[in-house]
Amino acid sequence: MSSRLNILLTFLALFFVILGACSSCAVFPRGPEPSPDLSKITFDLAPINDEGLAGPPDGLVAIDYELCIPATPQAQQEVNRMDPTVKFYPGSAGRIGCSKDQVLAIGNTHQKGWKIVLQQLTSLDYVKRIDRSFGE
């Protein structure tokens, strides 16, 4: 009798482990992924090459951009996961005009997949605009 009970308990334990592992499976669909909103980008991306550089052949430079995000660790972590080039400047409004409850974030295009990075950033609800940054 105890061996049957052990088998049953083992089966139930495995069932719940598998069920828990499948929480991200298609059986439990998540909400739709946010769509990128490229209208949030206020500068021309056309001159930027695949390496994220723009300018004459003998003077290529990365393009810096700035955005405002909520002044929370969660928002900073989310943005940093999307864009490893980003640096945060608490207390600075930047040219873009971040409010006191926001943090200025500055990144640049000189990274692999820079277009995808910008698209991901525009899909964040709290990102209202991405402007070119001139580092003044």
Listing of model-derived features with the role each one plays in the protein:
Residues 94-96, 132-136:
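Short linear loop/turn motifs
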Residues 27-85:
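N-terminal secretory signal peptides
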Residues 22-25:
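N-terminal Sec signal peptide cleavage junction
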Residues 72, 109-113:
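Helix N-cap motif at beta-to-alpha junctions
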Residues 93-108:
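Surface-exposed aromatic
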Residues 121-131:
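Short acidic amphipathic segments
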Residues 2-12:
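Bacterial N-terminal signal peptides that target proteins for export
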